[in-house]
Amino acid sequence: MSGGKSGGKAAVAKSAQSRSAKAGLAFPVGRVHRLLRKGNYAQRVGAGAPVYLAAVLEYLAAEILELAGNAARDNKKTRIIPRHLQLAIRNDEELNKLLGHVTIAQGGVVPNINAHLLPKQSGKGKPSQEL
């Protein structure tokens, strides 16, 4: 028998698989790891930290893009523009809290009119008291 655990046959070489593919992510785990090491955030970076961070970033991006796509569809547009990102973030309570101090270029403002500035309702809608 030849040396090895496969029982005589030569071991079939597996193709290399990225850490992103192993974790089932679209965001690059290797790049996040490199940025964590080069950013001087800590002397050492564990193996699980870049995977977790890439997963969180991917989730946030997917959440924002889904809401922005809904805002674009509401405005009868097929392309997401910064205005749609602004509306998506500001209309979502948790994202607005997370990105409260972020300025989005060309985002505009969320439409809002104070109730005191609206014209008062006239008596047309009230039921008549005729007998």
UniProtKB/Swiss-Prot annotation:
The modification N-acetylserine is found at S2. Keywords: Acetylation, Chromosome, DNA damage, DNA repair, DNA-binding, Methylation, Nucleosome core, Nucleus, Phosphoprotein. Phosphorylated to form H2AS128ph (gamma-H2A) in response to DNA double-strand breaks (DSBs) generated by exogenous genotoxic agents and by stalled replication forks. Phosphorylation is dependent on the DNA damage checkpoint kinases rad3/ATR and tel1/ATM, spreads on either side of a detected DSB site and may mark the surrounding chromatin for recruitment of proteins required for DNA damage signaling and repair. Gamma-H2A is required for recruiting crb2, a modulator of DNA damage checkpoint signaling, to DSB sites. It comes from the Eukaryota. It is found in: Nucleus; Chromosome. Pfam families: Histone, Histone_H2A_C. A motif ([ST]-Q motif) lies at residues 128-129. The modification N5-methylglutamine is found at Q106. The keyword RNA-binding does not apply. Core component of nucleosome which plays a central role in DNA double strand break (DSB) repair. Nucleosomes wrap and compact DNA into chromatin, limiting DNA accessibility to the cellular machineries which require DNA as a template. Histones thereby play a central role in transcription regulation, DNA repair, DNA replication and chromosomal stability. DNA accessibility is regulated via a complex set of post-translational modifications of histones, also called histone code, and nucleosome remodeling. In contrast to vertebrates and insects, its C-terminus is not monoubiquitinated. The [ST]-Q motif constitutes a recognition sequence for kinases from the PI3/PI4-kinase family. This is Histone H2A-beta.
